[in-house]
From Swiss-Prot:
Name of the featured protein: 5-hydroxymethyl-dUMP N-hydrolase
Catalytic reaction list: 5-hydroxymethyl-dUMP + H2O = 5-hydroxymethyluracil + 2-deoxy-D-ribose 5-phosphate
Sites where the protein binds 5-hydroxymethyl-dUMP: 7, 9-11, 77, 79, 83, 107
Record-level GO cellular component terms: cytoplasm; nucleus
Top-rank EC class of the record's enzyme: hydrolase
Keyword Nucleus: yes
Protein localization: Cytoplasm; Nucleus
Predominant localisation class: cytoplasm
Organism name: Danio rerio (Zebrafish)
Amino acid sequence: MNIYFCGSIRGGRQDVVIYQTIVKKLQQYGNVLTEHVSYDSLSDKGEDKDGDKAIHDRDVQWLTMSDVIVAEVTQPSLGVGYELGRAVAMNKRILCLFRPFSGKVLSAMIRGASAKPLFQVQDYKEDEVENILEEYFETLTKN
């Protein structure tokens, strides 16, 4: 299974430790095409060696190849929002993870999209994320 993980890069790297936990867990279920999002070495300046167009085209190709999208959406990010919009247009299965106790409010464009059958938003606390992913992928493999 190809898994596309979305997390903030240029929007801020405050949640990189959570991204690492999520990606490590996701690797139990398949190939995480975007594991680099969880790297400590990736700054909020992002990747720059190949340029923005190359990054965009590569990431859209990975989205196309993906069986499921998992996004940590607590840290607002234009890029993550764009990726989610493209994934919805491709009819991909999407799980968005949000920490309401962060003091942030999730965009209505994300929370409101969860009325679609393939789009799910799950509120969580950090110590719950691995169990949430286990439950999601158990259900996914049964269907």
